Amino acid sequence: MLDGFVPWPDHLADEYRRRGIWLGRPLGDLLHDSCRRHADRVAVVCDGHRMTYAELSRRADRLAGGLIGLGIRPLDRVVVHLPNIPEFVVLVFALLRAGAIPVLALPGHRKSEISHLCAHSGAVAYAVKDEFGGFDYRELAREIPPVRHVLVSGDAQEFTALESVGGDDVPLPRVDPSDPALFLLSGGTTGLPKLIPRAHDDYAYVMRATAEAMHVGEEVAYLAVNPVAHQAALACPGVFGSLLLGGKAVLTSSVRPDEVFPLIRREHVTVTTVVPSVLRLWADSGQRPDLSHLLVQVGSAPLDPALARRAGEVLGCRIMRWYGISEGLLTHTRFDDPEDVIMGTDGRPMSRDDEVRIVDESLNPVPEGEAGEMIARGPYTIRGYYRAPEENTRSFTPDGFFRTGDLVRRSPEGDITIVGRIKDVINRAGEKVSAEEVERQLRTHPSVQDAAVVGVPDTVLGERTYAFLVLTGAQIRTSAVKEFLRGCGLATYKIPDRIVPLDQLPRTPMGKVDKKTLRALAVSSAR
């Protein structure tokens, strides 16, 4: 057992295995089995290059042998800092086979985050691309505190070339499926990311259950446009869930319609995952591709129902709304849900074994239909962050529920609607303002492409409300925006005190709106 990892209680782990929720097999073995069953099929496509399952298995096992030869042992941590390229898939597969733990960093992470991840995880190795997106990751490797091995895909210079690491016929270790398979990162906008340990048992279940929810099998062709280090593109069913099924994973780092639409048609893509801003980009492209074969999962940020309807009409695709946290819980709409549920809610929990409660500040259930914090536990929601006892005391209840921090309402039918964040409530003159509620209304204005609302300290009101807007092109007067919000029925105290146009909203490496930066901008503009 890895020191600092919080496992599920033994009685629950036994029950999950007895009922077949957990298979009791490590992910590396499950992927290896899929490679044997589908040896001649195409597994991975990227930039015109195609890799079969047989080649994927051969490369992964040879790399696993090489990693073992470098002294990397079971439960050792390796920070993987690669973009959407085949080497990402091969390396993660190899680490799973070797029993080591990938720590999945995002392409946008830099010295602060990577130094923290290496130190906090106790990483023995750091894997990067030589250059990507105009950035030299080797220079970053020189700046962080030393690790035992730096592995570089491409021109390694003084480091170890990832492609040179290999070992044939190296015995692979036995891997305990209850151990962590990989570390995801928390997606908060304050502080450095926390490490989220996902066990082999629970993550294999996520891949199977999300595929079942979307009614996909071995014919699935999944397009990863989000970084594969994100949970959705990784495993919902994502790249690795598709590989477990025998399907095809198509990798790209572009969201441009003129590049993505031909790729979708050429590779007969059936599923992809996007954030609402990308869906808007596609819907506003002026193209009307026939994507009737495509299911688009939309999540990670609020989705305007009008945008969802328009995207479905313009692109011809099916829309499925998802809510998900890297810590576990997933909710989604169903194909047979009424249109208002699909377009206007975040659906119901994925698993019948998810336990979800909506509670007040004292953790007491709120009346049906009222907003409260969503807390959850179940067979794929973690029991604690890695090496974070103080944070675990704050984020988990004594009986094992994870406190999501999300403010939600639940309908009588069980559908969840995210209305904001517990910490994203502005206290203006004693009145509570949900930033999410105001943002949602602002996005319905025809001249507003995106919006973010923050509160900043004020000596008179306690907090003053700032709304940052990304416009579609036409300028709009502040008074017109406020009048529009009044017309939407918002209470007067919810109308933003200040409206600031921006070319784009700042975002964290996890892709979330960076409200810390926006608050600093608001404070500086108020001086």
Curated annotation (Swiss-Prot):
InterPro entries referenced in this protein's UniProt entry, alphabetically: AMP-bd_C, AMP-bd_C_sf, AMP-binding_CS, AMP-dep_synth/lig_dom, ANL_N_sf, ATP-dep_AMP-bd_enzyme
Residues reported in the UniProt entry to bind substrate: H230, Q231, K512
Family annotation (Gene3D superfamilies): 3.30.300.30, N-terminal domain of ligase-like
Assigned keywords, A-Z: Antibiotic biosynthesis, ATP-binding, Ligase, Nucleotide-binding
Binding residues for ATP: G187, G188, S300, A301, P302, D406, R421, K512
Enzyme class: ligase
Assigned protein family: Belongs to the ATP-dependent AMP-binding enzyme family.
Protein name per its UniProtKB record: Triostin synthetase I
Source lineage: Bacteria, Bacillati, Actinomycetota, Actinomycetes, Kitasatosporales
Gene: trsA
